[in-house]
């Protein structure tokens, strides 16, 4: 029983180490700018494409434009 607990704790610690090593710059960009979204100019799929738009809930602010013809279902996908 104690061995299983020790293995579980070690796996948990390893998982936390991996998660904390994820690119912190990407997290800072999301915190500063909001949630990224896929503009029409980014391509048809999110796989391998950069998400150049930002979701705004109350419409695009001044200096930004809606960069997606359809969706997202909540808010607008805007690009500067």
Swiss-Prot record:
Record keywords, A-Z: Cleavage on pair of basic residues, Disulfide bond, Ion channel impairing toxin, Nematocyst, Neurotoxin, Secreted, Signal, Toxin, Voltage-gated sodium channel impairing toxin
One Pfam family, short name: Toxin_4
Chief localisation class: secreted
Subcellular location: Secreted; Nematocyst
InterPro entries: Myo_ane_neurotoxin_sf (IPR023355)
Signal peptide: 1-21
A single GO molecular function term of this UniProt record: toxin activity
Substitution effect: residue 42 to A: 317-fold decrease in binding affinity to cockroach sodium channels and correlated loss of toxicity to blowfly larvae
Tissue: Expressed in gland cells and nematocytes.
Disulfide bonds: 37-77, 39-67, 60-78
Maturation-removed propeptide residues: 22-31
GO cellular component labels: extracellular region; nematocyst
Task performed by this protein: Binds specifically to voltage-gated sodium channels (Nav) (site 3), thereby delaying their inactivation during signal transduction. Has a strong effect on crustaceans and insects and a weaker effect on mammals. It strongly inhibits D.melanogaster sodium channel (DmNav1). It strongly affects the heart sodium channels (Nav1.5/SCN5A) and weakly inhibits the brain sodium channel Nav1.2/SCN2A. In vivo, when released into the medium, this recombinant toxin induces impaired swimming, paralysis and death of the crustacean A.nauplii within several hours.
Family from the record: Belongs to the sea anemone sodium channel inhibitory toxin family. Type I subfamily.
Note: This protein is encoded by at least 3 different genes. At least 3 other genes code for a similar Av2 with an Ile (instead a Val) at position 35.
Protein name in UniProt: Delta-actitoxin-Avd1c 1
């Amino acid at each position: 029983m104690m061995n299983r607990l020790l293995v579980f704790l070690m796996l948990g610690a390893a998982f936390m180490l991996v998660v904390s090593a994820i690119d912190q710059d990407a997290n800072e960009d999301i915190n500063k700018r909001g949630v990224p979204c896929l503009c029409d100019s980014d391509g048809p799929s999110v796989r391998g494409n950069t998400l150049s738009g930002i979701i705004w809930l109350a419409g695009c602010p001044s200096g930004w434009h809606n960069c997606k013809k359809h969706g997202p279902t909540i808010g607008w996908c805007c690009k500067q």
